[in-house]
Design a protein with these regions (language model features):
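Adenine nucleotide-associated cytosolic modules
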Residues: 1-187
Length: 187
């Protein structure tokens, strides 16, 4: 069944059977199940990432559905983490899904990221980006950081725990922008 499910990965010389086994053993925590996090979660599950954590304290709103396609109309009012976890299980029941219906904070960040090798930031605020950067640096975790604004986006991978030559988010952006100086995703 796995050979058939992951056949398109396995035939790629860059992935193959060994690479697919690594994906099946991988663990990723996705922080945010909205505009960025939702497609990340779908592709990670489809690729066969063995363990996926979903953390989000928000609920699904009607305005989310046109761009956060992991959620459905019947999920309006439901926790985004719960809705996303259900869709992941439907897409790939072999994936272990950890569900956290809470906000990541300074009080829970280090413990929250500990079980995962990679942390993917799908949030839309600078405070959380800096928090995840600092927690990943301290815990020796890889941080995948994405950001979107209208039709523009950026993606970076930070491995600052690997030492010199591996900058962190804070190395590139030492100070958060002043409040109100950068538009939010809702604008």
């Amino acid at each position: 069944d796995q050979i058939q499910r992951y056949a398109r990965h396995i035939v790629l010389p860059e992935v193959g059977g060994v690479g697919q086994e690594k994906l099946l053993e991988a663990s990723v925590l996705v922080v945010g199940a909205g505009g960025l996090g939702a497609p990340m979660l779908q592709y990670l599950a489809a690729a066969g990432i063995g363990r996926i954590g979903v953390i989000d304290d928000d609920t699904v709103d009607l305005s989310n559905l046109q761009r956060q396609i992991i959620h459905r109309t019947q999920d309006i009012g439901v926790s985004k983490a719960e809705s996303a976890a259900r869709m992941i299980r439907d897409l790939n029941p072999e994936v272990r899904v950890d569900l956290y219906k809470e906000r990541i904070t300074a009080a829970n960040a280090l413990d929250g990221i500990q079980p995962y090798a990679i942390v993917a930031d799908g949030t839309d605020n600078f405070a959380t980006r800096y928090l995840l950067n600092d927690a990943c640096h301290l815990a020796g975790k890889t941080l995948v950081s994405g950001a979107l604004l209208r039709f523009e986006g950026q993606l970076s991978v930070f491995k600052s725990h690997e030492g010199e030559g591996h900058p962190c988010y804070r190395c590139l952006f030492p100070e958060p922008p002043a409040p109100g100086s950068v538009p939010s995703c809702s604008e």
